[in-house]
Curated annotation (Swiss-Prot):
The lineage of its organism: Bacteria, Pseudomonadati, Pseudomonadota, Betaproteobacteria, Burkholderiales. It comes from Burkholderia sp. (strain RASC). GO terms for biological process: 3-phenylpropionate catabolic process. Belongs to the bacterial ring-hydroxylating dioxygenase beta subunit family. Pfam families: Ring_hydroxyl_B. GO terms for molecular function: dioxygenase activity. InterPro entries: NTF2-like_dom_sf, Rng_hydr_dOase-bsu. Component of the 2,4-dinitrotoluene dioxygenase (DNTDO) multicomponent enzyme system which catalyzes the incorporation of both atoms of molecular oxygen into 2,4-dinitrotoluene (DNT) to form 4-methyl-5-nitrocatechol (MNC) and nitrite. The beta subunit seems to have a structural role in the holoenzyme. Also able to convert naphthalene to cis-(1R,2S)-dihydroxy-1,2-dihydronaphthalene. This is 2,4-dinitrotoluene dioxygenase system, small oxygenase component.
Length: 194
């Protein structure tokens, strides 16, 4: 099944290519394996086991990027600005600094403790044709963050990941590209891992 972007003008070439990759390369066993993997990752992040997440899920060569795209219509644009801005553009060391900041007892952000609930949906997975140890994974994420009785935030995002099979049978995240749909976040902060 192919998407004709000339006829379906609202579909970007990138989205059409990704849809084709997952539609053609569908593998039920791989789908189940990746769904289980993402569920375990979400559980680690929900219970705030950030060091375990870094150790067991994240590869040292990670590229972790969260962007926000321009959501205004073309007629509303006055200037030729970039369509996307980085919210986060991090490597392993930068993620490690964020994790250590979360562990700091002086960090007011964790008092009272925050509760997270992640819903990972619409998971699709495909093996890379040129590098069979590499997996392409696309998913949607809903993240609920609650702190105190009246401070609740909900985040929605689409994630495009690359996971790599490593020696010893594990799988680690080497690239995460998160498309966060709010240009100006309506939350208190984005001190979260998506």
């Amino acid at each position: 099944m192919m998407i004709n972007t000339q006829e379906d003008k609202l579909v970007s070439a990138h989205d059409a290519e990704e849809f084709h990759r997952f539609f053609v390369g569908h593998d039920s066993d791989l789908q189940q394996e990746v769904t289980t993997l993402l569920t375990r990752e979400a559980d680690l992040l929900d219970i705030q086991a950030y060091k375990a997440w870094l150790e067991h899920c994240v590869a040292p060569e990670i590229k972790y990027q969260v962007i926000s795209r321009e959501l205004r219509s073309t007629s509303e644009r006055r200037y030729q600005l970039n369509d996307a801005v980085n919210i986060y553009n991090e490597n392993y060391q930068q993620l490690k600094v964020r994790v250590e900041h979360q562990m700091d007892p002086q960090n007011w952000y964790n008092s009272p403790k925050i509760r997270f609930t992640r819903f990972v949906t619409n998971v699709t997975a495909a093996k890379d044709k040129s590098a069979p140890e590499m997996l392409h994974v696309r998913s949607n994420l809903i993240l609920h963050r609650a702190r105190r009785g009246n401070q609740v935030d909900v985040f929605y995002a689409t994630r495009e990941d690359k996971w790599k099979r490593i020696e010893g049978g594990g799988i680690k995240l080497v690239e995460r590209f998160v498309d966060y749909p709010e240009r100006s976040p309506q939350t208190h902060n984005l001190m979260i891992f998506l």
